[in-house]
Amino acid sequence: MSPNISLDNTYITLPEEFYTEQLPSKVPSPKLVKWNSTLAKELGLDSDFFQSEEGALVLSGNQILEDTTPIAEAYAGHQFGYFTMLGDGRAVLLGEIVTNDEERYDIQLKGSGRTPYSRGGDGKATLGPMLREYIISEGMKGLGIPSTRSLAVLTTGETILRETALPGAILVRVAKSHIRVGTFQFANQFLDTKELKALADYTIKRHYKEIFTKEDRYRHFLHEVVKNQARLIAQWQLVGFIHGVMNTDNMVISGETIDYGPCAFMDTYHPETVFSSIDTEGRYAYQNQPKMASWDLARLAEALVPLLNDNTEKAIEIAQEEINQFSKLYLTFWYEGMRKKLGLFHENDMDEDLIEALLGLMVKYEADYTNTFRDLTLNQTTQPNLKGSAEYQQWLDLWQDRRKKQEESLEDSIKLMESVNPTVIPRNHRVEEALERAVNYHDYNAMDSLVSVLQHPYDYKNQNDYYATPPGKTACGYRTFCGT
């Protein structure tokens, strides 16, 4: 049986300092446990082949396709504010696939063994975190948020030592690219301007080709990246997503969400919510995500200074001007999104106060973030704390008055709300239930059911209360771990 697949690799046209040719480590008995047939179809892949034993050999990296050059990418980054040399320490890029509509995607194996960038790690991954990334990334796709995708998860037949012995696994990740802010930091810190320019030109041609011929293309490039990240972070905030580890190596230039280690979705609304066990100071808490994205982008701007203008002072001024746009862009995207969540079509002077008042009540009465907007969409109040609140009723009256002043009908307002207020999200306790069944009992039914529901989060005709129910009080204090 033949895979009938051709992988390109344009990344190796960059100077050799940006990567190392690296074969994945062979594993004893690769077994496919999760296959994303929908994504496979989008990529034009033969599901029959890849679900076969031979297909598992290819997906695990045990068998390398002809005429391909697997690589590990070099990059640096600020991790919790501290700069360090990094790189793909447990991942190998098999190559790039070009779809029928001329879209180019990286095919990367995560958990594929040691590389020159492993820094003492074993280069391996375990089953739970890889399945978790599969669930969350597909959940983000369903929510309409730009994200890397998960094509497959395989067990390797290995036992990996972490706090305990765990089953080894490999995730097959699909991304528009894996070029990170940290890739530009690496070029600026360790290479010459010539190599930095080569990286910038390659990235522009791959992701922002419409600006390549423009004068001041590097300024235009920085502007587009800032705008895309402002939009992305607004989308995160609007659904209560907390990434957990917004280091510069986890911000990709394409504008996709990447690296789902310690991420989680907020249940009870509170701006200071943080889930990651390693984020002890709350650096990447929910309310800090816009600020930290701006900080990361400032590091990109610093790296691009040699390209922005021959005069360093002028280049720094340009960089600062573009970074200063982030806050305005973010707030524009966020307020636009919040108005939609409230069924409001057009901007009004009272909207900011209306939105802030609702969020304040949600904090005061410990309301569930997702279900508050779900209830508003359904014209109901299911949360006990809000149900008996005179303050909340007063807010509802103000909101209804605001909606009635629109030219658009109430029916159109409800349709708008249904299109942006999910009935379900990847609730942390439901994700953990699915992972426990899969990892401990080899039972993937709960995971399959969860992923199926998450693919249609805005389906108000077929709501599933089981997946919409917040955790009980005993599930509070949820903590996430990066799984590295």
UniProtKB/Swiss-Prot annotation:
Binding of Mg(2+) occurs at 250, 259
Say which enzyme class the record assigns: transferase
Q: Which UniProt keywords apply?
A: ATP-binding, Magnesium, Manganese, Metal-binding, Nucleotide-binding, Nucleotidyltransferase, Transferase
Provide the residue positions that the database annotates as binding ATP: 87, 89-90, 110, 122-123, 173, 180, 259
Q: Which prosthetic group or cofactor does it need?
A: Mg(2+); Mn(2+)
One Pfam match, given by its short name, reads SelO
Q: Catalyses which reaction? A: L-seryl-[protein] + ATP = 3-O-(5'-adenylyl)-L-seryl-[protein] + diphosphate; L-threonyl-[protein] + ATP = 3-O-(5'-adenylyl)-L-threonyl-[protein] + diphosphate; L-tyrosyl-[protein] + ATP = O-(5'-adenylyl)-L-tyrosyl-[protein] + diphosphate; L-histidyl-[protein] + UTP = N(tele)-(5'-uridylyl)-L-histidyl-[protein] + diphosphate
Q: Where is the active site?
A: 249 (proton acceptor)
Q: Which InterPro entries match?
A: SelO
Q: What are the disulphide bonds in this sequence?
A: none
Q: What are the EC numbers?
A: 2.7.7.-, 2.7.7.108
Q: Where are the transmembrane segments?
A: none
Q: Name one GO molecular function term.
A: ATP binding
Q: What family, per the record?
A: Belongs to the SELO family.
HAMAP family per the record?
A: YdiU_SelO
Function of the molecule: Nucleotidyltransferase involved in the post-translational modification of proteins. It can catalyze the addition of adenosine monophosphate (AMP) or uridine monophosphate (UMP) to a protein, resulting in modifications known as AMPylation and UMPylation.
Record-given protein name: Protein nucleotidyltransferase YdiU
* Species assigned in the record: Lachnoclostridium phytofermentans (strain ATCC 700394 / DSM 18823 / ISDg) (Clostridium phytofermentans)
